[in-house]
Amino acid sequence: YELVKAIAADGGTGVFGGRIYVAQDAQRTQAYQRNNNLLLGDAAHVYSKPQLEIYADNVKCSHGATVGRLSAEALYYMRQRGLSDRDARRLQMFGFANQVIEKIPVEGLTGTIEELAAAKIDRM
């Protein structure tokens, strides 16, 4: 399972070119590749090219990519519950990023990366 996420802001550009390779003798392989991208503003761009290169017959592999913006409905909901627009945007961005951060298997590293991500999101 491969999960790659990106947030592109202002004039930023994100590029994802991932490949899952399954050799001929790797029968019964299961693999999934996913790339999710969040655009903040009209000047941001993302180019996504997930790829599967499969030479085995008996496999279960798939891939997908999404490009989207912050949910206006979710922002509205959070503002109606007292969050400022800025905090609602930050919360939505952090939730998007945290889906990757929480999968980090190294004990003690998750908190550090959460802090770095939150600091970066605060500057967006």
Please report, for each region that a protein language model flagged, where it lies by residue.
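Active-site gating/interface segments in enzymes
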Residues: 1-124
